[in-house]
């Protein structure tokens, strides 16, 4: 989690946030309920957060060769990292070099090979984990029930999970400022955790949604920055 926080600092600075706002952003991440739980218990979420953070940082800073080298390692922790890898195609700089397409495909194949081998040789205790496809198929007939669960008081509590103020500030940036401060690929990023939240359902909705933190906290900082500028101009 410390490594994730360090990468997050550089990520926020790459988005042109000043040092003060970057520190606030990292503090929000480190003090969130999900992060505290991940630090207190041996959950794989810690590695998951780090991998997602590294992926989007490398894409943001156009370090595509490092991104391709890192791709085979990502799926070892969680197969749900796969959709995040495709965010690179929404980066305009990715298409500037045609070789990037071939490199991306090769890295993707290597990632799948590493994933298959890791699942073959690494035994998981307890009930066998379901794949994304199985979870989606299980979700489809239960969509009304999932939506009712989300709208219930317990569902709302599970979703926010101590991040209510951050999500509220980020929504202001999304609807008022249109997230103009953020590159296009991060605007597509937000849909992945939302889908995972619907698929996961139950008490884990907040955990699945929390992976939105790089964009949610960035948008919250945009709102804070906007309020600071408005206050200083009055």
Locations of regions flagged by a protein language model:
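Perimembrane helix-loop-helix junctions
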Residues: 83-109
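Short helix- or helix-capping micro-motifs
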Residues: 22-31, 71, 75
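Transmembrane-helix signature of polytopic, lipid-linked glycan biosynthesis machinery
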Residues: 32-37, 118, 190-205, 227
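Membrane-embedded glycan-lipid processing machinery
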Residues: 28, 34-47, 200-212
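Membrane-interface alpha helices of multi-pass inner-membrane proteins
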Residues: 53-58, 65-90
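Hydrophobic, aromatic-rich transmembrane alpha-helices
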Residues: 5, 160-183, 187-194, 219
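Specific aromatic-rich, kink-prone transmembrane helix
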Residues: 46-66, 215-219
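Transmembrane-helix motifs of polytopic, lipid-linked glycan transferases
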Residues: 1-15
């Amino acid at each position: 989690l410390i490594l994730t926080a360090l990468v997050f600092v550089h990520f926020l600075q790459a988005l042109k946030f000043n040092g003060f706002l970057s520190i606030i952003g990292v503090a929000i991440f480190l003090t969130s309920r999900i992060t505290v739980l991940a630090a207190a218990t041996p959950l794989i979420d810690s590695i998951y957060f780090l991998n997602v953070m590294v992926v989007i940082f490398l894409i943001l800073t156009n370090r595509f060769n490092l991104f391709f080298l890192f791709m085979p390692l990502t799926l070892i922790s969680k197969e749900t990292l796969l959709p995040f890898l495709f965010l690179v195609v929404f980066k305009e700089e990715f298409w500037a070099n045609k070789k990037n397409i071939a490199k991306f495909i090769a890295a993707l194949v290597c990632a799948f090979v590493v994933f298959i081998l890791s699942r073959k040789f690494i035994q998981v205790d307890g009930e066998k984990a379901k794949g994304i496809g199985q979870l989606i198929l299980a979700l489809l007939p239960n969509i009304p029930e999932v939506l009712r669960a989300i709208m219930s008081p317990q569902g709302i509590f599970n979703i926010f999970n101590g991040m209510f103020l951050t999500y509220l500030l980020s929504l202001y940036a999304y609807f008022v400022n249109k997230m103009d401060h953020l590159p296009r690929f991060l605007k597509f990023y937000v849909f992945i955790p939302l889908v995972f939240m619907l698929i996961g359902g139950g008490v884990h909705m907040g955990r699945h949604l929390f992976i939105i933190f790089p964009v949610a906290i960035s948008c919250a900082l945009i709102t804070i920055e906007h309020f600071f500028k408005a206050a200083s101009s009055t």
